[in-house]
């Protein structure tokens, strides 16, 4: 009898030939058997192949069209229609440019990095993260306030590339097609319009340091980061095809725009009504490169970010939509948490309006929604796991406004009602 033959007395794996005594589990199929070790090996092979496919970066032949990109953005980001269109077109053109850049004789197209302008909590970071998820490319985020030019205490701009490299599991080829989002970019505007005679290591100096990597250069990146290990081997990363998205709230830029379009802010001629009617987001829609120059950016830096997308402030209706409509909305997240305890969680319409109004009072945009919910629901989330007879929890506006306890429906009450 051959080794692979199986009998009722001695069953063996049809793939590796091990007997049922030699393995933990033997699974039977139509005339074949497979052991747990072969199943594990198959899983490893499949996982490795999937990882190899991801390593190739975005499949440019299957690159989603601008409309398809926006449709997915709509699932996660409420409102901001103009900004989503600008981003969808810019990202599509960016990766099409990469596809054609490898063909000899083609017109050389320059990279169009993106500048997002909008109030805190309006969705800038979420838009950038969602784009990277749609395209399945490595994504890294940096805070411009931590950056300094080389030679000063702080974070080197090269560390941004290192973060992207880490997100790509140190696969240089994949990292070179990634997306980097630099937040708080408004904080590196120089302190005055005229060039500084003294060093401005967190302003103009950082702009100069960012210029090369944003436009495209071959950066030498230490795998472990920092300048403390000069003996380690550097990795070469070409930033030419990395898409840079920079975002900021740009406090004070509205005044620059107002001056340009003739809206007086002081004196007897002040147009108070017009100024009050125009919100920050609406004013930012009128921004020009000259406004950014006056705000404190050097001309070369403005030139590296040719695509401008403005996000407007979120109103009460938008906040309520953000709470319940996106795929990963806060309401859906909390309902899932309670569902794991076999409890139904319900929010009244009034409670959602109350949460939105509280967030607007804090002036933190959509970012404030989670903290309001966490504070309002802390006690009930503490109690419910210890009460297996709870069937439903109802959050009303009184819970949000007056810190009252939520309505709790118990199993006995459900039985009595039936």
From Swiss-Prot:
<dbReference type="Pfam" id="PF10431">
    <property type="entry name" value="ClpB_D2-small"/>
</dbReference>
<keyword id="KW-0862">Zinc</keyword>
<dbReference type="GO" id="GO:0051082">
    <property type="term" value="F:unfolded protein binding"/>
</dbReference>
<dbReference type="GO" id="GO:0051603">
    <property type="term" value="P:proteolysis involved in protein catabolic process"/>
</dbReference>
<dbReference type="InterPro" id="IPR038366">
    <property type="entry name" value="Znf_CppX_C4_sf"/>
</dbReference>
<dbReference type="GO" id="GO:0140662">
    <property type="term" value="F:ATP-dependent protein folding chaperone"/>
</dbReference>
<dbReference type="GO" id="GO:0046983">
    <property type="term" value="F:protein dimerization activity"/>
</dbReference>
<feature type="binding site">
    <location>
        <position position="13"/>
    </location>
    <ligand>
        <name>Zn(2+)</name>
    </ligand>
</feature>
<feature type="binding site">
    <location>
        <position position="16"/>
    </location>
    <ligand>
        <name>Zn(2+)</name>
    </ligand>
</feature>
<dbReference type="InterPro" id="IPR010603">
    <property type="entry name" value="Znf_CppX_C4"/>
</dbReference>
<feature type="binding site">
    <location>
        <position position="38"/>
    </location>
    <ligand>
        <name>Zn(2+)</name>
    </ligand>
</feature>
<keyword id="KW-0143">Chaperone</keyword>
<dbReference type="InterPro" id="IPR004487">
    <property type="entry name" value="Clp_protease_ATP-bd_su_ClpX"/>
</dbReference>
<dbReference type="GO" id="GO:0009376">
    <property type="term" value="C:HslUV protease complex"/>
</dbReference>
<feature type="binding site">
    <location>
        <position position="35"/>
    </location>
    <ligand>
        <name>Zn(2+)</name>
    </ligand>
</feature>
<dbReference type="InterPro" id="IPR046425">
    <property type="entry name" value="ClpX_bact"/>
</dbReference>
<dbReference type="GO" id="GO:0051301">
    <property type="term" value="P:cell division"/>
</dbReference>
<dbReference type="GO" id="GO:0008270">
    <property type="term" value="F:zinc ion binding"/>
</dbReference>
<feature type="domain" description="ClpX-type ZB">
    <location>
        <begin position="1"/>
        <end position="54"/>
    </location>
</feature>
<dbReference type="Pfam" id="PF06689">
    <property type="entry name" value="zf-C4_ClpX"/>
</dbReference>
<keyword id="KW-0547">Nucleotide-binding</keyword>
<comment type="similarity">
    <text>Belongs to the ClpX chaperone family.</text>
</comment>
<dbReference type="GO" id="GO:0016887">
    <property type="term" value="F:ATP hydrolysis activity"/>
</dbReference>
<keyword id="KW-0479">Metal-binding</keyword>
<dbReference type="InterPro" id="IPR003959">
    <property type="entry name" value="ATPase_AAA_core"/>
</dbReference>
<keyword id="KW-0067">ATP-binding</keyword>
<dbReference type="InterPro" id="IPR050052">
    <property type="entry name" value="ATP-dep_Clp_protease_ClpX"/>
</dbReference>
<feature type="binding site">
    <location>
        <begin position="119"/>
        <end position="126"/>
    </location>
    <ligand>
        <name>ATP</name>
    </ligand>
</feature>
<comment type="function">
    <text>ATP-dependent specificity component of the Clp protease. It directs the protease to specific substrates. Can perform chaperone functions in the absence of ClpP.</text>
</comment>
<dbReference type="Pfam" id="PF07724">
    <property type="entry name" value="AAA_2"/>
</dbReference>
<dbReference type="InterPro" id="IPR027417">
    <property type="entry name" value="P-loop_NTPase"/>
</dbReference>
<protein>
    <recommendedName>
        <fullName>ATP-dependent Clp protease ATP-binding subunit ClpX</fullName>
    </recommendedName>
</protein>
<dbReference type="GO" id="GO:0005524">
    <property type="term" value="F:ATP binding"/>
</dbReference>
<comment type="subunit">
    <text>Component of the ClpX-ClpP complex. Forms a hexameric ring that, in the presence of ATP, binds to fourteen ClpP subunits assembled into a disk-like structure with a central cavity, resembling the structure of eukaryotic proteasomes.</text>
</comment>
<dbReference type="InterPro" id="IPR003593">
    <property type="entry name" value="AAA+_ATPase"/>
</dbReference>
<dbReference type="InterPro" id="IPR019489">
    <property type="entry name" value="Clp_ATPase_C"/>
</dbReference>
């Amino acid at each position: 009898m051959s080794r692979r033959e199986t009998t009722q007395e001695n069953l063996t794996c049809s793939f590796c030939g091990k007997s049922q005594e030699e393995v933990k589990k033997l699974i039977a199929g139509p005339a074949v058997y497979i052991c747990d070790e072969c199943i594990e090996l198959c899983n490893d092979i499949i996982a490795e192949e999937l990882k190899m496919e991801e390593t190739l970066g975005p499949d440019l032949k299957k690159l989603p069209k601008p409309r398809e990109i926006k449709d997915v953005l709509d699932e996660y980001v409420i409102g901001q229609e103009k900004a989503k269109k600008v981003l969808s077109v810019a990202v599509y053109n960016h990766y099409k440019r990469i596809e054609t850049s490898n063909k000899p004789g083609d017109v050389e197209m320059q990279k169009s990095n993106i500048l997002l302008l909008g109030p805190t909590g309006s969705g800038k970071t979420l838009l950038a993260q969602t784009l990277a998820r749609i395209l399945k490319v490595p994504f890294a985020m940096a805070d411009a306030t931590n950056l300094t030019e080389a030679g000063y205490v702080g974070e080197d701009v090269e560390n941004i590339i290192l973060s992207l490299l880490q997100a790509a599991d140190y696969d240089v080829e994949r990292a070179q097609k990634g997306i980097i989002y630099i937040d708080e970019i408004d904080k590196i505007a120089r302190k005055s319009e005229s060039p500084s005679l003294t060093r401005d290591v967190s302003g103009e100096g950082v702009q100069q340091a960012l210029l090369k990597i944003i436009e495209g250069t071959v950066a030498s990146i230490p795998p472990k980061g920092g300048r403390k290990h000069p003996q380690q081997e550097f990795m070469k990363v070409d930033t030419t095809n990395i898409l840079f998205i920079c975002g900021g709230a740009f406090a004070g830029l509205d005044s620059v725009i107002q001056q340009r379009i003739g809206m007086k802010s002081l004196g007897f001629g002040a147009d108070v009504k017009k100024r009050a009617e125009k919100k920050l987001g609406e004013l930012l829609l009128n921004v020009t490169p000259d406004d950014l120059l006056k705000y404190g950016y050097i001309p070369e830096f403005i030139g590296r970010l040719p695509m401008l997308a403005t996000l407007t402030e979120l109103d009460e209706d938008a906040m309520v939509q953000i709470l319940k409509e996106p795929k990963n909305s806060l309401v859906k997240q909390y309902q899932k948490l309670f569902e794991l305890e076999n409890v139904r969680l319900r929010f009244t319409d009034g409670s959602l309006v109350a949460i939105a109004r509280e967030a607007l009072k804090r002036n933190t945009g959509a970012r404030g929604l989670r903290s309001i919910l966490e504070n309002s629901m802390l006690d009930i989330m503490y109690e419910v796991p210890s009460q297996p007879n709870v069937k439903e929890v109802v959050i009303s506006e009184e819970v949000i406004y007056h810190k009252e306890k939520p309505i709790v429906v118990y199993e006995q009450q459900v039985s009595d009602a039936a």
